[in-house]
Regions:
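Bacterial Sec-dependent signal peptides at the C-terminal "C-region" and cleavage site
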Residues: 1-25
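Boundary/entry segment of secreted carbohydrate-active catalytic domains
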Residues: 20-47, 55
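The substrate-binding groove and active-site-proximal loops of carbohydrate-active enzymes
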Residues: 29-31, 67-82, 120-135, 156-165, ...
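Aromatic-lined substrate-binding rim segments of carbohydrate-active enzymes
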Residues: 41, 58-110, 165-186, 228, ...
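Substrate-binding cleft and catalytic face of glycoside hydrolase catalytic domains
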Residues: 50-66, 84-163, 307-312
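Aromatic- and acid-rich polysaccharide-binding/catalytic face
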Residues: 138-142, 148-157, 189-227, 247, ...
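Aromatic-rich peripheral "rim/lid" segments of glycoside hydrolase catalytic domains that contact
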Residues: 267-269, 273, 282-290, 294, ...
């Protein structure tokens, strides 16, 4: 999922455990932008969420760069970051929320049409340096996960070319992480041309999917039309589940508040005033209704982390809000009811 990042951004995700027997263990989460505290977490708890995912970023110039920057290169900065993430984890745990730590790479200046799925160093020297830097980045956060008893850790997000061509690297990295961290592990694979091809699912606890599947070719689709669009994707998802005997976790899923949101759910809104981006809270709500009717109750389904909510949300934000957040919209009630 491509997003615009300004400054030092913290992303969170929250979920909760259902009272129904069939979904007692499902993760019920949503990515949330902004810092968290005991007060601004209450609306999420009220709406039946109880997992929180913290997303630390490492910066990379472009798809060819071997350098990853997640601190200023000194011990003081590392200690500060450790303190920030540890505090957020402790706030969540104090409220009874479980934590999913999910590192991402953000490219500052990618080539046209490229994003993090295209990251691939151009020669062996650059590859050696990139894997060394990525390993440091991931193990730094694995240590924070261990220190703070984090329940779930993500080894990477949407690095499609690297998972396809460098599987040995990931297998070794997983072993290195498990030497440090004893909790559950997953990887957040792109829905397109990645999750079916990964060979190291057997070494992880969940099959993670960034679930922006195209579900219709229609604007203003009905719940029935969107539900029909899920069928072919469910077949491929279930095949991977059966092959590796691992439950499926939607590490990310979301829909804009637009009439075309089920056509290409992964697309970010570039121009919020563009009249072609027609506001449709009903379409967003219909997308979630279809998800709960077609996916949620599958025995192989572990849960979902919805994109994206805000810790500083106010009701006035949603008046002309085309964005992914369900807050203050029809979808908010659909999700809350689905998570009961």
């Amino acid at each position: 999922m491509q997003i615009a990042i300004a400054g030092f951004l913290i992303v969170f995700s929250i979920g909760f455990i259902s009272s129904s027997d069939q979904s007692n263990d499902k993760q019920k989460g949503a990515h949330v932008f902004g810092s968290l505290n005991a007060t601004n977490l209450q609306p999420f708890v009220k709406n039946n969420y109880n997992w929180i995912t913290i997303v630390p970023y490492s910066g990379q110039k472009n798809e060819d760069s071997p350098n990853l920057v997640y601190h200023r290169g000194n011990r003081l900065e590392l200690d500060r970051r450790d303190s920030v993430w540890s505090h957020q984890i402790q706030v969540a745990h104090a409220l009874g929320l479980k934590v999913f730590l999910k590192p991402h790479i953000w490219m500052h200046n990618p080539s046209e049409g490229k994003w993090r799925s295209d990251i691939f160093p151009t020669n062996e020297d650059n590859w050696d340096l990139w894997q060394k830097n990525y390993r440091k980045f991931i193990l730094f956060y694995a240590k924070i996960a261990k220190k703070n008893n984090v329940e779930l850790f993500c080894i990477g997000t949407e690095l499609s070319r690297l998972t396809a061509e460098k599987s040995e690297f990931w297998e070794t990295l997983i072993k290195d992480i498990r030497h440090i961290y004893s909790g559950k592990l997953t990887y957040a694979a792109n829905w397109r041309n990645e999750f079916e091809k990964i060979t190291f699912w057997k070494d992880l606890d969940y099959i993670g999917i960034q679930a922006y599947f195209p579900l219709t070719k229609n604007t203003y689709p009905s719940v029935e039309q969107i539900s029909e669009g899920w069928q072919k994707h469910l077949l491929s998802i279930e095949q991977v589940h059966k092959k590796y005997n691992r439950k499926i976790l939607f590490t990310e899923m979301g829909y804009k508040s637009t009439a075309d949101s089920a056509i290409k759910p992964w697309e970010w809104i570039e121009n919020y005033s563009n009249p072609k981006d027609l506001v449709s809270y009903e379409t967003q709500a219909n997308c979630y209704k279809a998800f709960f009717s077609q996916v949620w109750d599958k025995d192989w389904f572990e849960g979902v982390h919805i994109w994206q909510l805000r810790s500083d949300y106010s009701e006035s934000d949603s008046t002309l809000n085309l964005d992914f957040t369900p807050q203050g919209k029809l979808a908010e009630g659909v999700i809350s009811k689905g998570f009961e």
